[in-house]
C-alpha cells in the first residue's frame, strides 16, 4: 500500500488510482532555452524514482513531462542569438535528453511540446471565453480568477487574502488585478500564431493545462513539480483545467524541495547556477543521482562537493559489496541455502518496501541498501558459498538498483564517451547518404556491442545505453 504526501490536502494519503493498475502522471518539464541546471535535474530524478517504484509494484505508468518551447525566456534568447525560437528549443531538447540520460532517467511516455499543441490551446481558451471564465481585453485574453471559487486551494490561500505581488501579473486592461494571462497579443518581431482573439501566443500556465488534458484526460492521478511551481503556476493550472473540464484536475499533488548551493539559494544574481551539462564532466552522473536521492524529495538539499564526495563513498560501498558477492558466486559450489541469511535479506527488502511505501522515502531506502551491503560483507567474510544465498543477495541488489535507478556497476574505462558515440552516429549517417551500407551496418554493430541502441526520431537519430 503506497502512501504519498498530497500538497492539496497537506497530509499523507493512501494512493488510489483512477483506473486500477494504472498511474497517470504529469510532471512539469523545463523551459528549453538553455542547458538544465541541477534544480531541474532534481524533479527529473525524484519523479523517475516514483515512476520506477510504481512499476516495481506492478503498475502501468503513463508518464508525461512537457517541454515549454514558447516562452519569454526563449524569445529573449532568440533575439540574443539571432536564431529562431524553434531552433533553440530543438537544440536544448536534444541536450536535455543527453543530460537526463546520463543521470539514468527513463524516457517519458510522452514529452509534449507547446508548439505542437497550439490549436488545442486556442480551442481550450475559446471554451473558457464562451463559458465566461475568460475575457478579451486589448488583444490579450485573461482568466477571471474570482469566478473560480476554489482558487487558492492548492497553496491554501483565500481569494480575499491574495494581494497583487511580484508573482501575480498586473495590468491596467484587466478587470481585476488577480486575473492572469491566457493569451498574449503579438509584439513586433516575436513568434506568434493566428487565433480568434488576434495574433499572439499563449501564456505559460495554459500550456501545461492543455498538454495534460490532451495527453492524460480531464483528471490525472498525480501532478508533480518543484515547490516553486506551487503558486501561481499549479494554482492557475487547477483554475483553468477545472473550469474547462468540470472535473478535478489531479487527485494528488507532489512537490519536491529546493536545491541550495553551499547553503545559498541558487540564483543568477549570485552566479552559482550549476548546469548538469558541465557538472557531469567533473562528477560521475551515477554519483550525482545517488546524491540527489540521499535526501527525501520534499526536503531541501544542499549541494556542495563535501556532500557529493560522501555520496560517492556511499555508492562505492554498495558497489564493492556487490562485486564481492559476484566474485564469491563465481567460485560457489554449495547449493544448500542458509535460511537465516535468506530471512535477513528478505527482511531488508521488506524494510526497503516499507520506507518506499511511505511517501517514497529514498533516504531511508538507501539506509536499507547500506544494511544489505553490510550483511553481504559479513557473509563473504564467513567464506560460505551457498549459491541460493548469493543468488538472493543479487536479486535484492538488482531490485534496489532498478527502483532507485543507480547502476550496480560503474562505466567501464573502455566504454565510448557520448562525444565518441555522436561522432560514430554522424559517420554512419554520412555512410548511409553515400550508400555505403556495409560501413553503416558495421558502425551499428560496433555500437550494439557497447550496448548502445540507436533510435530514429523526427529530430534525427538518438542513442540510448541499454
Curated annotation (Swiss-Prot):
The keyword RNA-binding does not apply. Zn(2+) binds at residues 28, 208, 233, 237. Gene3D superfamilies: Cysteine-tRNA ligase, C-terminal anti-codon recognition domain (1.20.120.1910), HUPs (3.40.50.620). A motif ('HIGH' region) lies at residues 30-40. ATP binds at residue 268. Pfam families: CysS_C, DALR_2, tRNA-synt_1e. Its cofactor is Zn(2+). GO terms for biological process: cysteinyl-tRNA aminoacylation. Keywords: Aminoacyl-tRNA synthetase, ATP-binding, Cytoplasm, Ligase, Metal-binding, Nucleotide-binding, Protein biosynthesis, Zinc. It catalyses: tRNA(Cys) + L-cysteine + ATP = L-cysteinyl-tRNA(Cys) + AMP + diphosphate. It is found in: Cytoplasm. It comes from the Bacteria. Its EC number is 6.1.1.16. GO terms for molecular function: ATP binding; cysteine-tRNA ligase activity; zinc ion binding. Its main location: cytoplasm. One of its GO terms (cellular component) is cytosol. Binds 1 zinc ion per subunit. A motif ('KMSKS' region) lies at residues 265-269. HAMAP family: Cys_tRNA_synth. Monomer. Belongs to the class-I aminoacyl-tRNA synthetase family. This is Cysteine--tRNA ligase. It comes from Staphylococcus saprophyticus subsp. saprophyticus (strain ATCC 15305 / DSM 20229 / NCIMB 8711 / NCTC 7292 / S-41).
Amino acid at each position: 500500500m503506497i502512501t504519498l504526501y498530497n500538497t492539496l490536502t497537506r497530509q499523507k494519503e493512501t494512493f488510489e488510482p483512477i483506473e486500477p493498475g494504472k498511474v497517470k502522471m504529469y510532471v512539469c518539464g523545463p523551459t528549453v532555452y538553455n542547458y538544465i541546471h541541477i534544480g531541474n535535474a532534481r524533479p527529473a530524478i525524484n519523479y523517475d524514482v516514483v515512476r520506477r517504484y510504481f512499476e516495481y509494484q506492478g503498475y502501468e505508468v503513463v508518464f508525461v513531462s512537457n517541454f515549454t518551447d514558447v516562452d519569454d525566456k526563449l524569445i529573449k534568447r532568440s533575439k540574443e542569438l539571432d536564431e529562431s525560437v524553434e531552433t533553440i528549443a530543438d537544440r536544448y531538447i536534444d541536450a536535455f535528453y543527453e543530460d537526463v540520460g546520463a543521470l539514468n532517467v527513463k524516457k517519458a511516455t510522452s514529452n509534449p511540446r507547446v508548439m505542437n499543441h497550439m490549436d488545442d490551446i486556442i480551442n481550450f481558451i475559446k471554451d473558457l471565453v464562451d463559458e465566461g471564465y475568460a475575457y478579451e481585453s486589448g488583444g490579450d485574453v485573461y482568466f477571471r480568477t474570482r469566478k473560480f471559487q476554489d482558487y487558492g486551494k492548492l497553496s491554501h490561500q483565500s481569494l480575499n487574502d491574495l494581494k497583487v505581488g511580484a508573482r501575480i501579473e498586473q495590468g491596467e486592461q484587466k478587470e481585476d488585478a488577480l486575473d492572469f494571462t491566457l493569451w498574449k497579443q503579438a509584439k513586433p518581431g516575436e513568434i506568434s500564431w493566428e487565433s480568434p482573439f488576434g495574433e499572439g501566443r499563449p501564456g505559460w500556465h495554459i500550456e501545461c493545462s492543455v498538454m495534460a488534458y490532451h495527453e492524460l484526460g480531464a483528471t490525472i492521478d498525480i501532478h508533480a513539480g518543484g515547490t516553486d511551481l506551487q503558486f501561481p503556476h499549479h494554482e492557475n493550472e487547477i483554475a483553468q483545467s477545472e473550469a474547462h473540464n468540470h472535473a478535478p484536475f489531479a487527485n494528488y499533488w507532489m512537490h519536491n524541495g529546493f536545491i541550495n548551493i553551499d547553503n545559498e539559494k541558487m540564483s543568477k544574481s549570485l552566479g552559482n547556477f550549476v548546469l548538469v551539462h558541465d557538472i557531469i564532466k567533473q562528477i560521475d552522473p551515477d554519483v550525482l543521482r545517488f546524491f540527489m536521492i540521499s535526501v527525501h524529495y520534499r526536503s531541501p538539499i544542499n549541494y556542495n562537493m563535501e556532500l557529493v564526495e560522501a555520496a560517492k563513498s556511499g555508492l562505492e560501498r554498495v558497489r564493492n559489496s556487490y562485486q564481492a558477492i559476484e566474485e564469491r558466486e563465481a567460485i560457489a559450489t554449495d547449493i544448500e541455502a542458509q535460511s537465516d541469511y535468506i530471512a535477513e535479506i528478505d527482511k531488508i527488502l521488506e524494510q526497503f518496501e516499507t520506507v518506499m511505501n511511505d511517501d517514497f522515502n529514498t533516504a531511508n531506502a538507501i539506509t536499507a541498501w547500506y544494511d544489505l551491503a553490510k550483511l553481504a560483507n559479513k557473509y563473504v567474510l564467513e567464506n560460505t558459498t551457498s549459491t541460493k544465498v548469493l543468488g538472493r543477495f543479487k536479486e535484492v541488489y538488482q531490485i534496489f538498483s532498478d527502483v532507485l535507478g543507480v547502476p550496480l556497476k560503474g562505466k567501464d574505462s573502455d566504454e565510448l564517451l557520448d562525444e565518441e558515440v555522436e561522432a560514430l552516429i554522424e559517420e554512419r549517417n554520412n555512410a548511409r547518404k553515400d550508400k555505403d551500407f556495409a560501413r553503416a551496418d558495421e558502425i551499428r554493430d560496433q555500437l550494439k556491442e557497447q550496448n548502445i541502441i540507436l533510435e530514429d526520431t523526427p529530430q534525427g537519430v538518438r542513442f540510448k545505453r541499454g
